[in-house]
Curated annotation (Swiss-Prot):
This is Zinc finger protein CONSTANS-LIKE 8. Zn(2+) binds at C21, C24, C44, H49. GO terms for molecular function: zinc ion binding. Belongs to the CONSTANS family. The keyword Metal-binding applies. It is found in: Nucleus. The gene is COL8. Residues 95-115 have a biased composition (Basic and acidic residues). The keyword Endoplasmic reticulum does not apply. SMART domains: BBOX (SM00336).
Amino acid sequence: MFCAEIMISKYQEDVKQPRACELCLNKHAVWYCASDDAFLCHVCDESVHSANHVATKHERVCLRTNEISNDVRGGTTLTSVWHSGFRRKARTPRSRYEKKPQQKIDDERRREDPRVPEIGGEVMFFIPEANDDDMTSLVPEFEGFTEMGFFLSNHNGTEETTKQFNFEEEADTMEDLYYNGEEEDKTDGAEACPGQYLMSCKKDYDNVITVSEKTEEIEDCYENNARHRLNYENVIAAWDKQESPRDVKNNTSSFQLVPPGIEEKRVRSEREARVWRYRDKRKNRLFEKKIRYEVRKVNADKRPRMKGRFVRRSLAIDS
């Protein structure tokens, strides 16, 4: 406390101008805190030293008593800022902007009339009531678009509403186009080659074949084919004298794809291969077994075994 008073006296002697608050830098310093080593104004001193219980115990020295309020001079206790509320504004801006009225109207319109229908919604399709006869050409319509209507711009730039299609009239017009197309093809062909199907009078008639001559040629062809027919009775008689080339025992298919004798050779080769594999395996197994027993006999003298097939020779000789 004595050191603080000495520093204040030196400060008052050396510096004539009042010192600014080190926290807000706007007002003159009224208090000096030795614990914080800071010069504070009256407002900053209240905010700093009422923060917690430890800060209230800091010893402070008043620099100019004439700037202190009457409450402080009278010895009234300072209430904590934490109980009365913050006096300073928050450092970070708390912007609470409400939505504009136009934006709210747009949101309400979107909710009432959605452009994209929700999947599974009841308002997705609008089916008008009609008789059973009219249900054949019924197409689901979206409710929002039926109210608004379809607008298409033509080549002049103006907007015109499209008419509802009548499918029966459209089908009739398509049929008319189809038949008119055939008639146009016929007329175009007739105009392109007007004399195609007509015979010129200047031509010779020697090259023309009459119908009677054609029929005579066809009959001659039938007679020639009849001459080349097979005599089935003679073929059957010659077939009975000879044996059938097919072998019923070795016939593996109805078409005799595999010649006789090949299947027997295949079975024989498979059996020989199995026998060869068995003998090779048996020989290897016996050889391995013989080696194993020989190794046990050699190691019988090194390992003392009282039971078993192989006993040490020294024990056998002693007994």
